[in-house]
Regions:
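N-terminal small-domain helix-loop-helix segment of the aminotransferase-like
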Residues: 5-109, 116, 296, 406-408
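Conserved core of the PLP fold type I
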Residues: 67, 71-204, 221-222, 226-236, ...
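PLP-dependent enzyme catalytic core of the Aspartate aminotransferase-like
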Residues: 88, 350-408
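Helix C-cap/helix->beta junction micro-motif
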Residues: 145, 176, 208-209, 365, ...
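Conserved core segment of the aminotransferase class I/II
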Residues: 235-312, 319-321, 397
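Conserved glycine-rich beta-strand-loop-beta hairpin in the small C-terminal domain of fold type I
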Residues: 294, 310-319, 331-345, 379
Length: 408
């Protein structure tokens, strides 16, 4: 049975105007002082949620639970299929086995899980290693925990692909006595999908210096080619050193419903994280969030397969259009996630523009992107491609006509 109001099984084509429907993505323009000029429709391409309906299996699971019992009393995970659904998903999508239910813990958010692991292994003022560019959620979480951020810059090779600088990482780890590193796998905001050998090398380097790894794998379902490699899966040592964070909220457009989970094989770390969460009553499972995950993971595989085709087409279209811009805007070839990190340095230098002016101009024609500077991209913008293909075509037509080729 289907409860979705959308006629099609998977509707990735309808342009959803979400203004006034409690959508931060649609109701907020993130560029201070910017506004959309009259005559241009809004094409929000900033914060990372999708302009697609969630999977029918998610709607079925939520409504099915409401129909089964309209009572929303105190809730327990037992009997929901929560653990089995997670293990099934990782087995089928990532070709890995999570053997023991106990290594899985409900988390109210990925960043909440990240924060707990930071607090387990470090004290206030201690350094935490991040890659740069980096996700703004990491910097905010580390700062909120009153720890010190140490950055290791990713380097771009001759093809523009972001690579880890292992020599620099080791230097930073030794000089700063790093005890915790945050790893984004795949990487946000660059969209880099790390190859297994890179993950292995990163883990080995951290193990060499007894650095604990927090691996944010919320984007792990958005791999354009091949399968995701969980950081904890590359070796037995990795299982002991890696605390991995996941959520179905990114994949199935459920960020507003809230809910995530961790996979932590280290018994001591897992116990301490649970103790910290208990102190604040933080990780109390949400009944509808859990049933949504079970519906997503048990029956949502086909939805994700079709979704990836749309994302891949959208990103490829944008990449192809940018190749006609004469090198003014650069990005690496899309590999994963549904965001791309656009480098406007050449454009700004040749046109005499500032990044503030570029962002204002993009918004003025309705293309609402995200300032890349908080992600440590000095002249960058992050674009979100989880929207109908027609919106991407229109957005990049406008950028070509009104930003790249126009005098302003």
């Amino acid at each position: 049975m289907a409860y979705s109001k959308f006629a099609k099984r998977y509707d990735f084509e309808t342009v959803m105007d979400r203004r006034g429907l409690d959508s931060r993505k649609w109701d907020v323009i993130p560029i201070p002082g910017a506004s959309v000029e009259p005559g241009f429709s809004h094409i929000p391409m900033w914060v990372a949620d999708m302009d697609f309906p969630t999977a029918p299996s998610v709607i079925d699971a939520i409504v099915g639970r409401l129909f089964a019992s309209p009572a929303m009393g105190y809730f327990g995970l037992e009997g929901t299929g929560f653990y089995d659904a997670i293990k099934k998903w990782h087995r089928e999508r990532n070709n890995v086995e999570i053997v023991d239910n106990d290594v899985i813990s409900y988390e109210n958010s990925v960043l909440g899980g990240v924060s707990n692991v930071i607090r387990v292994y470090t004290n206030e003022g201690d350094p935490v290693l991040l890659h740069s560019p980096t996700y703004i959620g990491f910097t905010g979480t580390v700062n909120a925990a009153k720890r010190t951020i140490v950055l290791s810059e990713l380097k771009q090779d001759e093809e523009g692909t972001y690579r880890m600088d292992f020599e620099d990482m080791e230097k930073k780890v030794v000089e700063n006595n790093i005890k915790v590193a945050i790893f984004c796998n795949p990487h946000n905001p660059t969209g880099r999908v790390w190859e297994p050998w890179e993950i292995q090398a990163f883990v080995e380097l951290m193990v060499k210096h007894d650095v604990k790894i927090i691996s944010d794998e919320i984007w792990s379902d958005f791999i354009m080619e091949g399968k995701h490699t969980p950081a904890w899966s590359v070796s037995e040592l990795a299982k002991d050193k890696v605390s991995a964070m996941y959520a179905c909220t990114k994949t199935f457009n459920l960020a507003g419903l809230v809910g995530a989970y961790s996979v932590i094989h280290n018994d001591e770390c897992r116990a301490k994280c649970r103790e910290l969460a208990a102190q604040t009553h933080y990780n109390q499972p949400n009944v509808l969030s859990v049933h949504a995950l079970v519906g997503a993971y048990n029956e949502g595989g086909e939805y994700v397969d079709e979704l990836l085709k749309v994302i891949k087409s959208n990103q490829q279209h944008a990449y192809d259009v940018m190749q006609t811009w004469g090198g003014l805007v650069k990005t690496q070839k899309p590999q994963g996630t549904y965001v791309m990190f656009l480098d406007w340095t050449e454009f700004c230098e040749k046109r005499g523009k500032t990044m503030d002016e570029v962002l204002q101009k993009c918004v003025s024609v309705g293309v609402i992107c995200q300032d890349g500077r908080p992600f440590h991209g000095p002249c960058h913008a992050r674009f979100n491609f989880a929207c109908p293909h027609s919106s991407v075509v229109e957005a990049f037509d406008r950028l070509t006509k009104y930003v790249i080729n126009a005098e302003w």
